């Protein structure tokens, strides 16, 4: 059993999603958004760090996955997003969690089946895959998508390792 924390970073809203892997299946544990005040950027970055640290303390994840920076419409937005990512990553590293990063295309491909999926499609598939009774907010759904992408990627790597080592289904004979 392992717990994965997925993060969809932002300088205003950072989504988080937590899943537990039991017997090769993902179970929903929690999700939500860290909303920062409208203050100066350094203060907002501290709020992201503190929020992610609280989530780590609450859920005690074994692994941490985060969305990579994409090229935003302007350089200032991309820099702020990168700094918010850095704040979240530092919280994970301080908690001694392994950090994995995925592009938006990889996440959409893993969750929806196409790298060009719309946010609504990600929300729908996250709701379906985790058997949720209600659709999560877009940022929380994206973060759950990050966690699911990490889980699926890890499963593929385990299967590939099993084939190359002579093991069966990721286990040695």
Curated annotation (Swiss-Prot):
Cystine pairings recorded for this chain: none
Residues that, per the record, bind Mg(2+) 1: 8, 139
Amino-acid positions noted as binding Mg(2+) 2 in the UniProt annotation, renumbered to this chain: 67
UniProt similarity note: Belongs to the RuvC family.
GO MF term (any one): crossover junction DNA endonuclease activity
Gene Ontology cellular component terms for the protein in this record: cytoplasm; Holliday junction resolvase complex
Record-linked NCBIfam families: ruvC
Keyword Repeat tagged: no
Described purpose of this protein according to its UniProt entry: The RuvA-RuvB-RuvC complex processes Holliday junction (HJ) DNA during genetic recombination and DNA repair. Endonuclease that resolves HJ intermediates. Cleaves cruciform DNA by making single-stranded nicks across the HJ at symmetrical positions within the homologous arms, yielding a 5'-phosphate and a 3'-hydroxyl group; requires a central core of homology in the junction. The consensus cleavage sequence is 5'-(A/T)TT(C/G)-3'. Cleavage occurs on the 3'-side of the TT dinucleotide at the point of strand exchange.
Enzyme Commission (EC) number: 3.1.21.10
Subunit structure: Homodimer which binds Holliday junction (HJ) DNA. The HJ becomes 2-fold symmetrical on binding to RuvC with unstacked arms; it has a different conformation from HJ DNA in complex with RuvA. In the full resolvosome a probable DNA-RuvA(4)-RuvB(12)-RuvC(2) complex forms which resolves the HJ.
Protein name: Crossover junction endodeoxyribonuclease RuvC
Subcellular localization, as worded in the UniProt entry: Cytoplasm
Organism: Aeromonas hydrophila subsp. hydrophila (strain ATCC 7966 / DSM 30187 / BCRC 13018 / CCUG 14551 / JCM 1027 / KCTC 2358 / NCIMB 9240 / NCTC 8049)
CDD domains: RuvC (cd16962)
């Amino acid at each position: 059993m392992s717990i994965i924390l997925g993060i969809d970073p932002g300088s205003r809203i950072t989504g988080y999603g937590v899943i537990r892997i039991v017997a090769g299946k993902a179970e929903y544990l929690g999700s939500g958004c860290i909303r920062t005040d409208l203050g100066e950027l350094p203060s907002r970055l501290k709020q992201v760090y503190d929020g992610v640290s609280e989530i780590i303390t609450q859920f005690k994840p074994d692994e941490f996955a985060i969305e990579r920076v994409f090229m935003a419409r302007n350089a200032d937005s991309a820099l702020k997003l990168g700094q918010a990512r850095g704040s979240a990553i530092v919280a994970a590293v301080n908690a001694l969690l392994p950090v994995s990063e995925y592009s938006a295309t990889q996440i959409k491909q893993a969750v929806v089946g196409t790298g060009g999926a719309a946010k609504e499609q990600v929300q729908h598939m996250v709701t379906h895959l985790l058997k949720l009774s209600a659709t999560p907010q877009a940022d929380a759904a994206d973060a759950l998508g990050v966690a699911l992408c990490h889980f699926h990627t890890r499963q593929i790597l385990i299967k590939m390792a099993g084939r190359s080592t002579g093991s069966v289904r990721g286990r040695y004979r």
